[in-house]
Amino acid sequence: MKRGEVYEYTVGSQRARIVIASATRYNPSRATFAVVLGAGVAAPPVAVMVPTADGDPVRGTIDVSRLRQLDSAAVQARIGRLTPDTLRQLDRALRTYFDLL
């Protein structure tokens, strides 16, 4: 798993699309993800919410304020990878969320 990749993720009967947010070198044992809210959810003007772009493999908004540790047993199909521009926006949102600017 690499940073910026998007996957289907299942917990119980709930399915979600997630994006790997942690650095690739940590992902074999300590991956962290952010949930991609559905396309029907409007992206509020909040610095920790990243709207996906036309070239991304999923439509919606990445919610950086709800980071979670990945359970590898819950990971389903790989959907694709975020575009470089969306990944840069994700970087900025993470720095904002952790007050690292």
For the regions a language model picked out, list residue spans one by one.
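Conserved functional hotspots at enzyme active or ligand-binding sites that engage polyanionic ligands
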Residues: 1-101
